[in-house]
Amino acid sequence: MEISNDDLRDKTAAMKQQAFAVKAPLTIVFVFDTNVIPAISGRNPIVMEWVKLYTGFAAQNVYLACASMGLGTCARGSFKHDDLAPVLKLAEGKVVTLCMPVGVPED
């Protein structure tokens, strides 16, 4: 995986009401690789439900880690899918499932 210094935060904020996502210094992007399950690769509805479930498990750990460090986060499923995948240079078969901006809470 190639790490970029490009600022891609605007690609993770789908709506103006989600301006906090653009302000966050870090966004964790969860990606599912459909190629790891060759027999059922693609966007099989049952597989995608399991992917969402396991993404949720991982996201819960991010919530707990952030809370323990005094940081804030929020799981976001609404983002610009069509804009985000190309700028992340995702290979064929990789699907973004969730974005979690992380930062210091304003409150």
Question: Across the structure, where does each feature detected by a protein language model lie?
Answer:
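Acidic, surface-exposed loops and disordered segments
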Residues: 1-107
